[in-house]
């Protein structure tokens, strides 16, 4: 739903990918590119959003130098006006970046799908929302296949999904054609209780790559001031089960996996 943290989630994932030495292209149609860059800066520099502008130059320089030793990944943020850019524009952008900057992204973030345009249909021209949003989803998936790169985007929920504590694929706003096209979908679920703990629930809705019943629901921590996601203690996952929000079969699988890889750090 609106305000749950779609952009924060995507900027946090983008920051994590950058730290792995990968190239990231972030296309925004909702927020100014400076605001997106600001969120990624806060995450990477480990500084609160409100403190970024007043960060002393020496401290900034130290953090930047330290960051440069950690990663060789490059970030490009590109802003388009809302509902005016489609896959044709994105293809031209990829070609231009490859030609002029020798930049090939390892992942593309698009913020967000519902406010893209379709390259095949004109909005409002005797085309209903189901067909229009499905067309955008198909075009973005085609872009991912053609360029062999993952495309990560977001959508909204319906009014019913906005107040629901257990979102399903049927709660996707505007078009069920979107989940029919996507390869992997998950929902971000928030509540007053989770917000008080600085946490958010993630629920797998669709997964063509693995069994979606494995770790169907799990909890992650949220630091909104630094636009950062982090792992929470195992107790939070157990509390999720005790509250009836998860399957016992999923939990046993999750606990078993956690035990096998308990010494690993991400």
Which role fits each region the language model picked out?
Residues 49-56, 78-84, 118-134, 161-170:
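Flexible beta-alpha connector loops of hexameric P-loop NTPases
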Residues 6:
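Conserved lysine of the Walker
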Residues 16-104, 172, 217-218:
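Cytosolic-facing regulatory segments adjacent to core modules
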Residues 3, 88-105, 122-124, 139-147, ...:
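C-terminal regions of RecA-like/P-loop NTPase motor modules
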Residues 115-118, 187:
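Residues immediately C-terminal
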Residues 1-2, 29:
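P-loop (Walker A) phosphate-binding loop of NTP-binding proteins
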Residues 109-110, 149-156:
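Structural recognition of the conserved hydrophobic beta-strand(s) that form the central parallel beta-sheet
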